[in-house]
């Protein structure tokens, strides 16, 4: 298992190349379907993989939260992904995948880990509507392996939001209206939970917004906007004042999207704000390397609104 994740820190050099590496895992044979589905998680978010340690159970926790474990003196919540996804299996999870999102550490119980797969984000597709409905919006991207198996990228942000890790209701109440009616933010994110949080923050600010569900669709839409502005003799910055992007997205990731935006002179005066749960300093530095202007962690709507307010008013023409 240590061999599987060896040099995981060095894998961050893939950022900006539209490539990623995913740790594949299974949740056990589902007695209802007779299938053992394969899921994936970006190795950027994996801290370690271990045998399941002793778990301290606590009352009044969501059904899929097994309890807490102590890792080097830090209490970490543990989520049983089979229970969360509704997989009915007789197999007891034997592996815990320790992950970090937005500075929060949690353990995910799985049946087994398979291998680490390197691929291009262009090989990751938006899940078909049927699969999306079947999985309750839990899958953000899918890819097919040479042996015909389907690997599904799990929307971990949705898991964490629904198991009580992120609750932004109170923070949203502190978001103030911008007081300017002619500002527009364009954002790209593949997570339905993240998109909902962004929209809530922007609506609280009373800011106009446009969006796309992945980097490729975002780039296509931004090109359409830029072409329209060019034909009308207007700067693109008259139509969009800030571009907000996630990092992990099927077809094109946020690093590649940012690089392409920065290489197109029509977007020269429009800041790119990276909005991601990849919270390590190394990932922030990688964003800066491709031209990201600012970084805001996900699920912190007050920080998001404050940063957007500053960027939206910075170069405003009165």
Which functions belong to the PLM regions below?
Residues 1-241, 247-256, 263-268, 277-289, ...:
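An acidic, low-aromatic, low-complexity terminal/linker signal
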